[in-house]
Amino acid sequence: MEGAELIIQEINREAEQKIQYILSEAQKEAEKIKEEARKRAEDRAQWILRKAKTQAEMEKQRAIASARLEVRKKRLEVQEEMIRAVLSALRERLASLPADEYFQTLVTLTTEALEELNIDSAVVRSNEETLKLIVEKLPEFKKSVSEKLGKEVEITVGEPISTIGGVLVESSDGSVRVDNTFEARIERLEADLRARIAKALFG
């Protein structure tokens, strides 16, 4: 009887050891699974965080780019407004030149046109007030232009045109012309004027 009990005790002891081993292995496996799950969760969290940071940086850069674009747009609008104001003031200044200064300007513009056309006889056209000034001083006008050119030229006053000032000079038959009205001169020089005005105003 005592031998049977010993056998039963041994069996129970071995069973208990197996149970403890199984439980221990199960615990280890559970910890391993938990650790792997934690690591995956952590990796996932890090990935989400990196993605969020990347998206946030992209949004930040987009916002900065948009703000810079808006600032540039506003700056260009202000620049354009100021350039237009300067050009408008220039037109007004040219349209209100004192008579003597304006007369000399007309002589210069006519001389330049005749040089470009390479003709000795021309028709000069402008607004009514300008033509009236030229007619009043026609002998002096012809003499001044001739002296600048270094040769005698024949100048005829033509029909009035719509302009704030300056002259349109054309050949007697109207086949060739040079538009030296103030509007045309400003238009031809506008790109250069804009660059100079922008540099003066904005550096």
Swiss-Prot record:
It is found in: Cell membrane. Disulfide bonds: none annotated. The keyword Transmembrane helix does not apply. It comes from the Archaea. GO terms for cellular component: plasma membrane; proton-transporting two-sector ATPase complex, catalytic domain. InterPro entries: ATP_synth_B-like_membr_sf, ATPase_E_C, ATPase_V1_Esu. One of its GO terms (biological process) is proton motive force-driven plasma membrane ATP synthesis. It is a peripheral membrane protein. Its main location: membrane. Keywords: ATP synthesis, Cell membrane, Hydrogen ion transport, Ion transport, Membrane, Transport. One of its GO terms (molecular function) is proton-transporting ATP synthase activity, rotational mechanism. HAMAP family: ATP_synth_E_arch. Belongs to the V-ATPase E subunit family. This is A-type ATP synthase subunit E. It comes from Thermococcus kodakarensis (strain ATCC BAA-918 / JCM 12380 / KOD1) (Pyrococcus kodakaraensis (strain KOD1)). The lineage of its organism: Archaea, Methanobacteriati, Methanobacteriota, Thermococci, Thermococcales.
